[in-house]
From Swiss-Prot:
Binding site for ATP: H16, D164, G165, K166, K230, F231, D239, R245, K246, A262, K266
Organism: Helicobacter pylori (strain P12)
GO biological process, one term: one-carbon metabolic process
Cofactor names: Mg(2+); K(+)
Assembly behavior: Homotetramer; dimer of dimers.
GO cellular component terms, A-Z: cytoplasm
Family named by the database record: Belongs to the AdoMet synthase family.
Protein name: S-adenosylmethionine synthase
Top enzyme class: transferase
Residues holding L-methionine: E57, Q100, D239, K270
Length: 385
């Protein structure tokens, strides 16, 4: 008997208010880390109707021109006219950034050269064989749709689109394998002149059908494009945006647990970010090595402590090896101290703006070192001993 179910994931465009906040926070981080690799950065951003507030804590000798950084991000996204709900030229930018607490810093920067974890917490990584990038199919497709919304807007293929938007993809699984697409939801901000009929037809023809893999298509897919009938007011005019509110969009679309820590605006001494990247690196290499078809990896840390307090591997009954054996392999092959993660993944670089929209995982860019499968052979060798 077939075990059949639907699973759904969503994505948002770079013009979504929460993603605007993430991108501003990461742009601040990139500006600082490019000039001061020892900097400690925890940058939070709020965008709302006509203004942006940047806050958080820093430990750096670098002066960051917050107004210029924020305005450039908003301009690049495409909020270049007040009619879109936000304008990079006229929006107020408030700077409320303070200094990092010395109580925290004393546990992170150590005299022996090691780095203690910047906070306690648990982080998850995940990989599976549903796509070439070893990501779950629903979130993979959802990101492709939102990215295409932005590209078709920017290249004027669909000039009536505006920056804010979302996608949602429901996939049918049988015996834990994706077999078809059931439902596509796309909500996109648009100019007031375009008819909903034209918008729906254009989005489906120019974006959806050009993105979706043919093997998952059929005649009964349900399409909902702007199901409320109108989406003119968008961006920060429609909803306030905050850094760190799209943590499921940023990761695996709900396919695995989440430890709760957001990524954007945090330098790699914060294990919320760096250890989540490391957990993806571990999970992806386990699957790429062939020791399992699916892997969920949990790492946990204590503030100021060098080694992880726990490592857990769940292969969802797709491996002949036990969790105990896999944990030993992970400890042997990967460096999972904060310093080990930072060095092995080369994280002290201004790469974070690239991560802040369309997912931190499953995008095989040169800068995304945690997406490499260069540990797969070491994993194979470990189990041949």
């Amino acid at each position: 008997m077939k075990d059949s179910f639907l699973f759904t994931s969503e994505s948002v465009t770079e013009g979504h208010p929460d993603k605007m906040a993430d991108q501003i926070s990461d742009a601040v981080l990139d500006y600082i880390i490019e000039r001061d690799q020892k900097a400690k950065v925890a940058c939070e951003t709020l965008v709302s109707n006509g203004f942006c507030m940047i806050t958080g804590e820093l430990k750096t000798s670098v002066y960051a021109p917050m107004q210029e950084i924020a305005r450039e991000v908003v301009k690049k996204i495409g909020y270049t006219d007040a009619l879109y709900g936000f304008d990079y030229r006229s929006a107020a930018v408030l700077n409320g950034v303070g200094e990092q607490s010395p109580d925290i810093n004393q546990g992170v920067d150590r005299e022996d050269g090691e780095i203690g974890a910047g906070d306690q917490g648990l982080m998850f990584g995940y990989a599976c064989k549903e796509t070439e990038t070893l990501m779950p199919l629903p979130i993979h497709l959802a990101h492709q749709l939102t990215f295409a919304l932005a590209q078709k807007r920017k290249d004027n293929t669909l000039p009536f689109l505006r920056p804010d938007g979302k996608s949602q993809v429901s996939v049918r699984y049988e015996n834990n394998k994706p077999v078809s697409i059931d439902t596509i939801v796309i909500s996109t901000q648009h100019s007031p002149e375009v008819s909903q009929k034209h918008l729906k037809e254009a989005v489906i023809e120019e974006i959806v059908y050009k993105i979706l893999p043919k093997e998952y298509l059929h005649d009964n897919i349900k399409f909902f494009v702007n199901p409320t009938g109108k989406f003119v007011i968008g961006g920060p005019q429609g909803d306030a945006g905050l850094t760190g509110r799209k943590i499921i969009v940023d990761t695996y679309g709900g396919s695995c647990p989440h430890g709760g820590g957001a990524f954007s605006g945090k330098d790699p001494s914060k294990v919320d970010r760096s250890a989540a990247y490391a957990a993806r690196y571990v999970a992806k290499n386990l699957v790429a090595s062939g020791v399992c078809d699916k892997a969920t990896v949990q790492l946990a840390y204590a503030i100021g402590v060098i080694e992880p307090v726990s490592i857990y591997v769940n292969t969802h009954n797709t491996s002949k090896y036990s969790s105990t054996e896999l944990e030993k392999c992970v400890k042997s092959v990967f460096k999972l101290t904060p310093k080990g993660i930072i060095e092995s993944l080369d994280l002290l670089r201004p790469i974070y703006s690239l991560t802040s929209a369309y997912g931190h995982f499953g995008r095989e860019l040169e800068e995304f070192t945690w997406e490499k499968t260069n540990k797969a052979e070491e994993i194979k060798a470990f189990f041949k001993r």
